[in-house]
Regions:
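N-terminal Rossmann-like NAD(P) cofactor-binding subdomain of oxidoreductases
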Residues: 1-162
Length: 162
């Protein structure tokens, strides 16, 4: 069964996470939270000035982005504690707004029903910072619920220095 993921913030990082996750059968993106409407988000997903055209059928159905027939709920909520993560069965939230990089603020996603939060930036007060290829073996599912994946610079350089 696929892990249910929600993306909070559908900018450059959020859309790239979606592109990668969509092609992974072990991941199901069930929702996107962003202040922009579904039609604009669908267009930005389909046509990326850096990565090119997303090679899947992308359309809109009300408040949903539809990719290859799969509906992804679009929400526009500024308070993460009010998001319907529990109702949607969200296990992991990718926090990519840049606004909730403190553990205490990111914890609102857990209040909303998510099991884990991955912050796509350096964070303060997170349970652990993980850099793949460097320290991912330190992850403990029972203890670590708010995870930072450090900065893009750290992710580029740290594996070489390890």
């Amino acid at each position: 069964m696929a892990v249910k993921v929600a993306i909070n913030g559908f900018g450059r990082i959020g859309r790239e996470v979606f592109r990668v996750a969509f092609t992974n059968p072990e991941v199901e993106v069930v929702a996107v939270n962003d202040l922009t409407d579904a039609a604009t988000l669908a267009h930005l997903l389909k046509y990326d000035s850096v990565h090119g055209t997303f090679p899947h059928e992308v359309s809109v159905d009300g408040d949903n982005i539809v990719v290859d027939g799969k509906k992804i709920k679009v929400i526009a909520q500024t308070d993460p504690a009010k998001l319907p993560w529990g109702e949607l069965g969200v296990e992991i939230v990718v926090e990519s707004t840049g606004r909730f990089t403190e553990g205490e603020k990111a914890k609102a996603h857990l209040t909303a029903g998510a099991k884990k939060v991955i912050i796509s930036a350096p964070a303060k007060g997170e349970d652990i910072t993980i850099v793949m290829g460097v320290n991912e073996k330190k992850y403990n599912a029972a203890e670590h619920h708010i995870i930072s994946n450090a900065s893009c610079t750290t992710n580029c350089l740290a594996p070489f220095t390890n």
